[in-house]
Amino acid sequence: MARKCEICGKGPQFGNRVSHSNRKTRHKFNPNIQSVRIEINGVSRKVKICTSCLRSLKKSV
């Protein structure tokens, strides 16, 4: 379950790197995953979440 957000399920996406001469090579875009200790139902737990979910959590508190 590496490189996947435990809250929203956001995972890697695939695309191309495009050079100036328009050659294309496959590339994987990983989400920005951070390990954060948060409290869920009164229990402190370490979860891997993306930064957009982390931002939403901080705004809701």
Curated annotation (Swiss-Prot):
SUPFAM superfamilies in UniProt: L28p-like (SSF143800)
GO biological process assignments: translation
Transmembrane regions listed in the UniProt entry: none
Swiss-Prot/TrEMBL keywords: Ribonucleoprotein, Ribosomal protein
InterPro entries assigned to the protein according to its UniProt record, in alphabetical order: Bacterial_rp_bL28 (IPR050096), Ribosomal_bL28 (IPR026569), Ribosomal_bL28/bL31-like_sf (IPR034704), Ribosomal_bL28_bact-type (IPR001383), Ribosomal_bL28_sf (IPR037147)
Pfam families tied to this protein: Ribosomal_L28
GO molecular function, one term: structural constituent of ribosome
Cellular-component GO terms for this entry: ribonucleoprotein complex; ribosome
Family: Belongs to the bacterial ribosomal protein bL28 family.
Name of the protein described by the UniProt record: Large ribosomal subunit protein bL28
Species whose genome carries this gene: Nautilia profundicola (strain ATCC BAA-1463 / DSM 18972 / AmH)
